[in-house]
């Protein structure tokens, strides 16, 4: 029986509609809309497209945008000065530096410069430390989106064997901690893991986040597993057209998995939605609409 398709796009639309209604209810109480600043450096087309998507989502929800664009020839000090100004700007609830930065730009100083309470990407060491300690805080958007999707679909996590393939600070490491906090038994695999197929075949939940097209084949998945594909890869088809694919051989794996996310339309929309959710969480805390995360 083919897998259930985990439709992140549909869930994201429902969550964003709920958030839009909440924003309209909060604005009269607070006296201002929530504010998000997305900072982009350079002319990378993919980054530009991602930023446009985030700004359109903000517009739909009634979130004010305070984004800035810097050229690759600009000074890193200018970016840091801008972050300092946004930290102090009471209209701004969330700050995000769009990654990756151009060659020669160190991403660490700007990530450290963001006020942890406005760190809606969840990448400041304080927020990562809170995650490690199991304390409330702003969480990384893609891992949070994966968890919300699993929970919304009623997929059990506690007591399950989960394998996360990919150890990045953006996805693999924080998602492993979130699954562990949800009482899964977690294995974090990576490019140096010997016999990856043996590891993934033992899993009830497999998350692919390595950026290698169709790495996970059908023979690497046990029947009835849940497969989450975080990968986004552009490949050229035999006709010369460009195609967007994930880290999973989707057509083959969906025939034996219990549930699977497509690419596109799976995890990607949830990432943007969790960015918006983090921005609203910061807005509520800073506006005293709630007292904790």
UniProtKB/Swiss-Prot annotation:
One of its GO terms (cellular component) is cytosol. Disulfide bonds: none annotated. InterPro entries: Aminoacid_DH-like_N_sf, NAD(P)-bd_dom_sf, THF_DH/CycHdrlase, THF_DH/CycHdrlase_cat_dom, THF_DH/CycHdrlase_CS, THF_DH/CycHdrlase_NAD-bd_dom. The keyword Oxidoreductase applies. It comes from the Bacteria. Pfam families: THF_DHG_CYH, THF_DHG_CYH_C. GO terms for biological process: L-histidine biosynthetic process; methionine biosynthetic process; purine nucleotide biosynthetic process; tetrahydrofolate interconversion. PROSITE patterns: THF_DHG_CYH_2. The keyword Transport does not apply. Keywords: Amino-acid biosynthesis, Histidine biosynthesis, Hydrolase, Methionine biosynthesis, Multifunctional enzyme, NADP, One-carbon metabolism, Oxidoreductase, Purine biosynthesis. Pathway: One-carbon metabolism; tetrahydrofolate interconversion. Its EC number is 1.5.1.5, 3.5.4.9. NADP(+) binds at residues 166-168, 191, 232. GO terms for molecular function: methenyltetrahydrofolate cyclohydrolase activity; methylenetetrahydrofolate dehydrogenase (NADP+) activity. It catalyses: (6R)-5,10-methylene-5,6,7,8-tetrahydrofolate + NADP(+) = (6R)-5,10-methenyltetrahydrofolate + NADPH; (6R)-5,10-methenyltetrahydrofolate + H2O = (6R)-10-formyltetrahydrofolate + H(+). Catalyzes the oxidation of 5,10-methylenetetrahydrofolate to 5,10-methenyltetrahydrofolate and then the hydrolysis of 5,10-methenyltetrahydrofolate to 10-formyltetrahydrofolate. Homodimer. Belongs to the tetrahydrofolate dehydrogenase/cyclohydrolase family. This is Bifunctional protein FolD. The gene is folD.
């Amino acid at each position: 029986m083919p897998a259930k398709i985990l439709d992140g796009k549909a869930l994201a639309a429902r969550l964003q509609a709920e958030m839009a209604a909440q924003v309209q209810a909060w604005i009269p109480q607070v006296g201002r809309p929530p504010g998000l600043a997305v900072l982009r450096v350079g002319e990378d087309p993919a980054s530009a497209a991602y930023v446009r998507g985030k700004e359109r989502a903000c517009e739909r929800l009634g979130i004010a945008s305070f984004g800035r664009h810097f050229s690759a020839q600009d000074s890193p000090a200018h970016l840091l000065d801008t972050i300092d100004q946004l930290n102090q700007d009471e209209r701004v609830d969330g700050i995000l530096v769009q990654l990756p930065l151009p060659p020669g730009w160190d991403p660490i100083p700007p990530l450290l410069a963001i006020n942890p309470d406005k760190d809606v990407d969840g990448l400041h060491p304080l927020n990562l430390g809170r995650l490690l300690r199991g304390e409330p805080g702003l969480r990384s958007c893609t891992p949070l989106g994966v968890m919300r999707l699993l929970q919304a679909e009623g997929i059990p996590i506690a007591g399950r064997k989960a394998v996360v393939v990919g150890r990045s600070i953006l996805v693999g490491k924080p998602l492993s901690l979130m699954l562990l906090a949800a009482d899964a038994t977690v294995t974090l695999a990576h490019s140096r893991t010997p016999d990856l197929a043996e590891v993934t075949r033992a899993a009830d939940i497999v998350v692919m986040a390595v950026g290698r097209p169709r790495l996970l084949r059908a023979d690497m998945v046990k029947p009835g597993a849940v497969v989450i594909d975080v990968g986004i890869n552009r490949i050229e088809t035999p006709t010369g057209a460009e195609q967007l694919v994930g880290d999973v051989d989707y057509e083959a794996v969906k025939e034996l998995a219990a549930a699977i996310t497509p690419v596109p339309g799976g995890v990607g929309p949830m990432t943007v939605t969790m960015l918006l959710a983090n921005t609203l969480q910061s807005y509520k805390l800073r506006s005293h609409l709630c007292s904790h995360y």
